[in-house]
């Protein structure tokens, strides 16, 4: 059974699951499925268990509907990386606290963020950016400035170690200069996306300790950034509680102000489970399936970095025997290809539907209209995501796997 809700001229559908949706709609275009309950659970998990303040990294999924779900679940601070994101969150959530955490900003963006949208938190990784912020804001006395330190991404699936961050050898002078310009001084870093070990944060916080000792400055904020992982096929990270515990211990041992705050910037961890997508098979060629979404749609990561997403056939008349497939997207471009492997029924054929899960992070956000393809149709479903970091079963599964590997 599905339900219809009317809000002005907007008709919203809530379905039990993807199977009910395709039976009712038989969609010819890709359909993105929203799971507000999954985002609510993730947000409350961070609000209740992370030993500090959680800032949602808007770039991971800037959906206004998602932003409202996170706000209602206790996420009050937002990591914005462009003036467009500043405007979006300010319009959607007028009472939210915005933190402009991109280390390279235009003077115009800084000035608008400060003067129009009330942004008081900015990040930087060089003296030029510090001078730019001070000049664009008029050298006020209410700035929180976070110096971004370069740290290793060795434990992450996607490195973020080369583009931003001051080297430890240069941090002393920058921290001292920033301390003079800031009401509150912070240090931030990013261990890389999808960090598969909590020890990534230990190593990073060791560098933070060295920077503080060398500069001999009072630090008011430690921002451990993002990197908190989600579960995908072939990637089952440790429980998030393990990350929180190890960060808390390292934070408490730092030589910082007694009233210093601990921040984090989860993106993927808050939104990966929020979305899946329903696609239709347009053609089968051996073990290759031509589907109606791809590299220029919600499956950018599956194509360009070989990310594997969970898949399931939507129907009840196909073989129980599975075979591995790769996908071609709908465009005319050869790189619109996702190697997988994606396990699906051995007798799948054109006209069948597939649900691809865990695309809430950097899925819908990366969608384009290239080659005339793409769909913005969304519907809400009430079932659980295909994988989760927030159920006892997922955490138990990881611990069981670990015991087996240790005893071998």
Annotate each predicted stretch with a short phrase.
Residues 1-142, 176-182, 214-218, 381-408:
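A charged N-terminal "starter" segment
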Residues 39, 59, 82, 113, ...:
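Conserved, mostly hydrophobic/aromatic
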Residues 57, 125, 144-150, 188-190, ...:
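Short beta-strand segments
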Residues 60-62, 84, 104-106, 126-128, ...:
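Active-site-proximal loop/turn and secondary-structure-junction residues that shape catalytic pockets
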Residues 66, 86-89, 109, 132, ...:
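Active-site-proximal flexible loops/turns
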Residues 91-93, 114-115, 137-140, 156, ...:
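Solvent-exposed alpha-helices and their adjacent loops that cap or buttress functional pockets
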Residues 151-287, 371:
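Active-site loop/helix belt of alpha/beta enzymes
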Residues 246, 261-408:
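Charged (often Lys/Glu-rich) extended helix/loop segments that serve as interaction or gating elements
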């Amino acid at each position: 059974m599905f339900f219809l809700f009317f809000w002005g001229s907007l008709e919203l559908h809530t379905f039990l699951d993807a199977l009910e949706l395709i039976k009712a709609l038989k969609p010819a275009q890709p359909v993105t499925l929203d799971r507000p309950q999954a985002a609510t659970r993730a947000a409350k998990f961070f609000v209740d268990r992370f030993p500090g303040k959680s800032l949602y990294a808007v770039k991971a999924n800037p959906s206004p509907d998602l932003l409202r779900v996170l706000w209602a679940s206790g996420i009050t601070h937002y990591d914005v990386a462009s003036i467009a994101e500043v405007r979006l969150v300010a319009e959607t959530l007028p009472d939210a606290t915005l933190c402009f955490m991109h280390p390279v900003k235009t003077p115009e963006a800084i000035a608008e963020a400060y003067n129009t949208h009330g942004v008081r938190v900015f990040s930087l990784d060089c003296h030029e950016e510090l001078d730019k912020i001070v000049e664009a804001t008029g050298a006020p006395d209410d700035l929180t400035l976070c110096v971004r330190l370069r740290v290793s991404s060795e434990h992450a699936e996607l490195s973020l170690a080369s583009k931003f961050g001051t080297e430890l050898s240069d941090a002393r002078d920058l921290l001292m200069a920033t301390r003079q310009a800031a009401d509150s001084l912070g240090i931030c870093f990013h261990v890389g996306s999808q960090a598969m070990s909590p020890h990534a944060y230990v190593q990073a916080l060791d560098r933070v300790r060295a920077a503080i000792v060398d500069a001999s400055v009072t630090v008011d904020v430690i921002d451990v950034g993002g990197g908190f992982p989600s579960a995908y096929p072939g990637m089952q990270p440790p429980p998030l509680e393990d990350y929180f515990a190890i960060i808390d211990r390292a934070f408490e041992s730092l030589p910082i102000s007694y009233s210093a705050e601990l921040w984090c910037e989860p993106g993927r961890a808050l939104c990966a489970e929020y979305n899946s997508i329903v696609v239709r098979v347009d053609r089968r060629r051996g073990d290759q399936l031509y589907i109606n979404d791809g590299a220029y749609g919600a499956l950018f990561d599956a194509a360009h970095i070989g990310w594997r997403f969970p898949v399931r056939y939507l129907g009840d008349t196909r073989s129980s025997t599975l075979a591995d497939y790769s996908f071609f997207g709908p465009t005319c471009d050869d790189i619109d290809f996702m190697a997988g492997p994606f396990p699906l029924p051995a007798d799948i054929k054109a006209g069948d539907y597939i649900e691809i899960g865990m695309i809430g992070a950097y899925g819908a956000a990366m969608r384009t209209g290239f080659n005339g393809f793409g769909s913005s149709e969304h519907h809400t479903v009430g079932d659980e995501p295909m994988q989760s970091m927030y159920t006892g079963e997922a955490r138990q599964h990881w611990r069981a796997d670990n015991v087996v590997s240790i005893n071998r």
